[in-house]
């Protein structure tokens, strides 16, 4: 049997028959009882699929989403091809029931009525919160690893993340707060990055100061041009591709850099910008560590010249 890893696939022995019964409590206090490791798993969102491919073998997926096969937004395109059945990114209760899963993992972003309807079918449903920081991401890895009976593998994934984070800390840890570069990130909807969002934690852990948070941006809002000017970022971060809204990301970048009202901004004057794929900017899986390392390397390339 084969199990996915971040760099490919690796052989391992999977002895489900010897597994004892166990139970797991999800983020909402629901107790899930297992007689054996689940073998027909359905994940309701891409970030959970990204985790699962490093936890279980392809034949333990009952299906995988079309999103997982889209290299613009997915970090697991190659691994996802090993799952036989492909379904749309969001499917209804009846379609999930027809898959006959023995474990359904959904995120709280699906509405309560949908989740309740899933539970009413008798399916085993695990509900997870949307991670907004590294601790929440790693806690979710722990709980999902336990649910699929792969706690040891989950522990290793977290250890691997921490090794990457330690590399970043060794490079940027000694930079005084006031000397850290200020960055402002753009989506097609505008400058974003509230202090309560996942990107803020990615930004800060990479050694940057999040300009949107410094300007007091609230969750769900976008930063005004006046705030961008007063924050005066050293770096602008643009998307390589937008997973959230249709539009021309190249035109977005050109419009911002040529905007007359932004010409006093350091990042605009110096044409100092970074382009990062959405699959990293919003990474809520083990790949959050990769996103932090990638952003840090692009923001402070001089610190990584010998790596």
Predicted features along the sequence, with ranges:
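Alpha-helical, coiled-coil/dimerization segments enriched in small aliphatic residues
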Residues: 70, 192-220
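Short helix-initiation/N-cap motifs at beta->coil->alpha
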Residues: 27-29, 83-94, 131, 216-225
């Amino acid at each position: 049997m084969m199990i996915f890893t971040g760099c490919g696939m690796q052989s391992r022995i999977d002895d489900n028959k010897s597994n004892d019964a166990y139970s797991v409590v999800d983020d909402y206090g629901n107790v899930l009882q297992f007689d054996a490791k689940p073998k027909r798993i359905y994940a309701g969102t891409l970030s959970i699929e990204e985790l699962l491919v490093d936890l279980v073998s392809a034949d333990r997926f009952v299906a995988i989403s079309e999103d997982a096969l889209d290299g613009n937004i997915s970090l697991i395109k190659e691994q996802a091809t090993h799952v036989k059945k492909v379904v749309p990114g969001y499917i209804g209760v009846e379609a999930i029931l027809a898959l006959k899963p023995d474990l359904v993992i959904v995120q709280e972003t699906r509405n309560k009525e949908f989740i309740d309807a899933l539970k009413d079918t008798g399916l085993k449903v695990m509900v997870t919160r949307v991670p907004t920081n590294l601790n929440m991401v790693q806690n979710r890895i722990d709980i999902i690893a336990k649910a699929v009976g792969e706690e040891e593998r989950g522990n290793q994934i977290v250890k691997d993340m921490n090794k990457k984070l330690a590399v970043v800390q060794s490079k940027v840890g000694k930079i005084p707060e006031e000397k850290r570069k200020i960055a402002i990130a753009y989506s097609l909807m505008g400058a974003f990055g509230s202090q309560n969002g996942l990107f803020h934690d990615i930004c800060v852990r990479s050694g940057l100061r999040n300009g949107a948070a410094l300007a007091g941006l609230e969750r769900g809002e976008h930063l005004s041009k006046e705030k961008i000017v007063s924050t005066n970022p050293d770096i602008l971060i643009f998307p390589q591709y937008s997973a959230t809204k249709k539009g021309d990301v190249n035109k977005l970048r050109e419009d911002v850099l040529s905007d007359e009202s932004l010409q006093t901004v350091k990042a605009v004057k110096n044409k100092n910008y970074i382009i990062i794929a959405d699959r990293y900017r919003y990474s809520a899986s083990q790949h959050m560590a990769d996103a932090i390392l990638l952003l840090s390397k692009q923001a402070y390339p001089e610190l990584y010249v010998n790596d």
